[in-house]
């Protein structure tokens, strides 16, 4: 499947976050890295297989064990996801998004200054 059009569920994203951090791992490694309450082994195993079908992870087989690793970078997924949010909720306008964040989430002056500096450095 094409990861460009796929979104991750909350559970899938949690497992991808772990795999991005670990770079690779068996189901037990993923479980060990999970915060409590941990999902069941079979649940994690099912989710990584779904991620594989979606094209987000691949595995290396060692007998009956599978070591999973991400096929997409965290930054790449984040960029696609945020572009989708920007287009779906803010009409593609970064200004509208920042305005929403400043009113709804109370962006601080120092955070606004950081954004301005980032924009100035892009020129």
Feature roles, as predicted:
Residues 5-11, 62-81:
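Short, cationic-aromatic polyanion-contact patches
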Residues 13-18, 29, 96:
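Pre-recognition alpha-helix immediately N-terminal to the DNA-recognition helix
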Residues 19-23:
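Short helix-to-turn junction characteristic of helix-turn-helix DNA-binding domains
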Residues 24-34:
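Short acidic, hydrophobic short linear motifs in intrinsically disordered regions
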Residues 58-59:
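Short beta-strand "wing" residues that participate in macromolecule-binding interfaces
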Residues 80-121:
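Amphipathic alpha-helical dimerization/coiled-coil segments
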